[in-house]
Structures are given as C-alpha cells and as structure tokens.
A protein has these predicted regions:
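N-terminal domain-onset segments
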Residues: 1-54
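Low-complexity intrinsically disordered segments
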Residues: 3-18, 23, 106-168
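Generic serine detector
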Residues: 12, 40, 49-51, 77, ...
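Generic alpha-helical propensity signal that fires on short helical segments
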Residues: 31, 35, 42, 82-84, ...
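Residues in flexible loops and secondary-structure boundaries
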Residues: 32, 80, 129-131
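Aromatic- and glycine-enriched beta-alpha-beta binding-site module
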Residues: 52-104
Length: 168
C-alpha cells in the first residue's frame, strides 16, 4: 500500500466518523458516559478508594466508542452507576465490578451507563497501516474493524457502523 492510499484511507475514515457522529446526534441517539479511573491510594493509615472522573460522552457502537467530534476509542469496561446494596464477599471479579459500580455512583447519575478503561484510537495513516489502531485496520485501501477474536470476524467499517448505529 502506498503512502497516498493510506492517507486517503485515513481522510475517508475521519470523514466517516464525523458523518456517523452527526447522524447519531441528529437522531438524538442515546449516548453513554465516559470516565477515567483514578486508582485507589494508600498513604500511611489512610486508604482512598478508586474513583471515576467524567471524561465526556460517546455512543457505544460494538467494539468502538464514538464521540460527537468524531473521535474514536476501543471499548474497555462498562458499568452502571448504582450504589451496591450489600457486600457479598464473592469472587475477586464480582467484588471488582461492585467497586466499579460504587465508584461510578459517586460521580454519575443513578442508573447511568459508564464506560471506562477505553483506549483512544490513533486515526492517522501510519497507525492504520501498521496496525496500531487496533481494532481498526487497513485492507486493500479500505478501513475494516475487527469485531471479534476470530480471523473471519473482520468487517468493512462503513457497513459495521451502519449496522451498529441502528441499535443506538
């Protein structure tokens, strides 16, 4: 693939993401909160809990998050802002999810869906060509999205976004 083809694909990608965001915004599609996680700290005898800080809003489109400006992220984890009713002392993963719900409930409206641990996607030509924009990749000059782990779980991004947009 030539440099010009990669640059053209990156330009087309940016335009597609902006168009998709504008269409979702015009439809008043339901978006979700984005958050960054501040890890818990222990200073001498004082222990602070992990917290979530609001970081914007985006639409969840399968393995991608898209904001109103056309920026994209690979999805991370998701929780709902609710105060857990009781500690159950189950497995570590259950307790981690409970802690995430509690952290989200401190900064977001009760019941709000909160995405955290998402990774910003570089959308430039070199990142697309090198595979650094995973789950986005360039095949034959067209941007595709890897929506699963299997080799056959690859789809042209335009069609993928059109399908996923219908569910938002």
């Amino acid at each position: 693939m030539t440099d010009d083809e990669a640059v053209t694909a990156a330009d087309s990608l940016a335009r597609l993401l902006r168009e998709t965001a504008a269409e979702l915004d015009a439809r008043h599609a339901r978006d979700e909160a984005l958050a960054t996680v501040k890890a818990s700290r222990k200073l001498l005898l004082v222990h602070t809990s992990a917290s979530m800080q609001p970081a914007g809003r985006a639409w969840r489109l399968g393995v991608l998050l898209l904001d109103r400006d056309g920026r994209a992220w690979a999805t991370g984890s998701i929780t709902r802002a609710t105060e857990p009713k009781r500690e159950q002392n189950l497995s570590a993963s259950v307790e981690e999810r409970r802690d995430a719900r509690r952290a989200a409930s401190r900064r977001f409206t009760e019941g709000e869906v909160v995405n955290f641990g998402h990774v910003p996607l570089p959308l430039d030509a070199e990142s697309l060509r090198s595979g650094a924009a995973d789950p986005l990749l360039l095949r034959d000059g067209v941007v595709h999205v890897r929506w699963g782990q299997g080799a056959d779980e690859l789809r042209e991004l335009r069609a993928y976004l059109a399908d996923r947009s219908e569910f938002v």
